[in-house]
Amino acid sequence: MSNLGKSTGSRKDTKMRIRAFPMTMDEKYVNSIWDLLKNAIQEIQRKNNSGLSFEELYRNAYTMVLHKHGEKLYTGLREVVTEHLINKVREDVLNSLNNNFLQTLNQAWNDHQTAMVMIRDILMYMDRVYVQQNNVENVYNLGLIIFRDQVVRYGCIRDHLRQTLLDMIARERKGEVVDRGAIRNACQMLMILGLEGRSVYEEDFEAPFLEMSAEFFQMESQKFLAENSASVYIKKVEARINEEIERVMHCLDKSTEEPIVKVVERELISKHMKTIVEMENSGLVHMLKNGKTEDLACMYKLFSRVPNGLKTMCECMSLYLREQGKALVSEEGEGKNPVDYIQGLLDLKSRFDRFLQESFSNDRLFKQTIAGDFEYFLNLNSRSPEYLSLFIDDKLKKGVKGLTEQEVESILDKAMVLFRFMQEKDVFERYYKQHLARRLLTNKSVSDDSEKNMISKLKTECGCQFTSKLEGMFRDMSISNTTMDEFRQHLQTTGVSLGGVDLTVRVLTTGYWPTQSATPKCNIPPAPRHAFEIFRRFYLAKHSGRQLTLQHHMGSADLNATFYGPVKKEDGSEVGVGGAQVTGSNTRKHILQVSTFQMTILMLFNNREKYTFEEIQQETDIPERELVRALQSLACGKPTQRVLTKEPKSKEIESGHMFTVNDQFTSKLHRVKIQTVAAKQGESDPERKETRQKVDDDRKHEIEAAIVRIMKSRKKMQHNVLVAEVTQQLKARFLPSPVVIKKRIEGLIEREYLARTPEDRKVYTYVA
């Protein structure tokens, strides 16, 4: 027992040891495994894989890699695959160069892919371990690289593949039917052979394809241009682009779409832009002239694809638009009707607005170009501000005649578009004031609402300073109505008589209304003069310290006129009268609507039958220019308005000419409006000169005010900076020239508002 105990005490604890898996294999055994795998790979390549055990093959490959023979396996695989592709596949493809080449190559490619998938599955462990550790291509990619280098990129195969694909596409472009599937398969193969890149596809197919396409389209463009009009050419280019996109979609890799479309655009559009837009009898100008909105839209769509395409279109459109605009605003022909002048511009704007909307997708570049062109030619004619005001005057006087309020509103909105293009807005304001005054004083406005609406548009555009005087005119009219009500009440209360004269006086604030600097003289006939004196006393009694000055050129009168002579036909027989009130056999009564000057002239003939021009001038004291205009209206106007006759019967009026009442005057209308000659043609040259002088005087003050405002704020400024700032501030009303600004600066220096700095005479300081 003691021995057992001793024995037990001396025994140590033991651990179970597992012997490591032997890391070395007999070379003979390794070779035998490799021979087995090599044979299997070759059988797979020959499509004889049905008798193979993939599990056994996988285990053998696993064993080789595990025992550090991965390199032998990998190298062996490369050699076996290379040998098969060189000796079998390449030979088959070479033998098919002239017979079913693409089909043979495609079949070889499909077989190779299938084989490589199977081989990859067998060698999966090598892919996971050896390939990863040694940073080499995986099994499948190795197969692709060998196929690429030994088959697809082998000398004549590579060239033949490229040429075959290019020939097929060239034939299809000419209308032949080709095997699109074969092209697609070849392109897909080239993309896969690039190993997630485009290099193989790009070098072996796409680059030569684009080069060939460029040559083809270059020749096609010459043919298209020689045989077709611009619109047909554009349609053919569109069709070509769509055809190329469709070909890419069905045959090539989708990445080729962008480059091939760029080639088409470059060869068929970019290189021929000017030729297309300038085509005689079919280019851009032809389309604009003939309102071809659809063709223009096609051109716009096509040209928007290429750099500078829209710019080229815009330049051509601009040349045509400026030519059209200059023809409309040219100063040729003094008798240009202002309403027609502006309507022509509005029609032109309407046409190009339609092109902008329907053809040019409201493109900003086209919009700016059209606006710039209108601004350019509208301001070529110095009469544009006056004519625009006369156009608005015509619409606000005659708006009801055949036009609804909405239509008038729409026309005024269009007129405002032209107003925005106008540089001399201050000139427009002066004329608008004159024409508004005439409408208000002769009760010719279509409605106060329309007038105020127009002023509101101007206010929105230019601010309240622009319209303050116009609004003041409306206030004066309202106050005058109240004053006249009070005056009539005063006459009733006092029993004072105006001697049969129905008098209406409008008291106008000098600063608001377009009064003339020197009021034209006129010897008002006694009856109306007496009536006015009664009003003057009444008004000044209420408003002491004020002055009333008659503005004869702004007044009007309704005269009761009686004509006694028989009315004769051309054959000399006498006729009855339709429109006039007839008393007795031949006496006719009319109400003549005339100006104050015309009234003064006509009332002379209550005293005598005949007057010479000099006599009328002496009696009335009307300035010669106004007198000639009034007499032309009365004696040389329309036959239905000639209440005076003149000897000799010429349109010119000279000192010795004799005037008498036209006793044969008749009209279908009881109330006859005597139009002032040339009133609708705008001002005469002397009047225009006077208006321009007034505008220039006003501008001097505005420029000086702007200079003082700026200098007061900045204290010190360099000349060019000040000129730029003044121009910026005033451009909403007019564009002052740098020369005029300089003169005004010098004027302010003389008057000691500004001073030059001693160190630099081109720098000014504000003198507080």
Swiss-Prot record:
Signal peptide limits: none
Subcellular localization, as worded in the UniProt entry: Nucleus
Cystine bridges: none
GO molecular function (one): ubiquitin protein ligase binding
One of the GO biological process terms: protein monoubiquitination
Keywords: Cell cycle, Cell division, ER-Golgi transport, Isopeptide bond, Mitosis, Nucleus, Transport, Ubl conjugation
Cross-link (Glycyl lysine isopeptide (Lys-Gly) (interchain with G-Cter in NEDD8)): 712
Source organism, top-level taxon: Eukaryota
Residue segments, region Disordered: 677-698
GO cellular component: centrosome; Cul3-RING ubiquitin ligase complex; cytoplasm; mitotic spindle; nucleus; polar microtubule; spindle pole
Biased composition (Basic and acidic residues): 682-698
InterPro entries assigned: Cullin, Cullin_CS, Cullin_homology, Cullin_homology_sf, Cullin_N, Cullin_neddylation_domain, Cullin_repeat-like_dom_sf, WH-like_DNA-bd_sf
Pathway participation: Protein modification; protein ubiquitination
Main localization of the protein described in the UniProt heading: nucleus
Post-translational modification: Neddylated. Attachment of NEDD8 is required for the E3 ubiquitin-protein ligase activity of the SCF-like complex.
Domain Cullin neddylation: 698-760
Oligomeric and partner information: Component of multiple BCR (BTB-CUL3-RBX1) E3 ubiquitin-protein ligase complexes formed of cul3, rbx1 and a variable BTB domain-containing protein acting as both, adapter to cullin and substrate recognition subunit. Interacts with btbd6.
Protein family: Belongs to the cullin family.
Function: Probable core component of cullin-based SCF-like E3 ubiquitin-protein ligase complexes which mediate the ubiquitination and subsequent proteasomal degradation of target proteins. The E3 ubiquitin-protein ligase activity of the complex is dependent on the neddylation of the cullin subunit. Involved in ER-Golgi transport by regulating the size of COPII coats, thereby playing a key role in collagen export, which is required for embryonic stem (ES) cells division. May play a role in the regulation of mittotic entry via ubiquitination of aurka.
Protein name as catalogued: Cullin-3
Organism classification: Eukaryota, Metazoa, Chordata, Craniata, Vertebrata
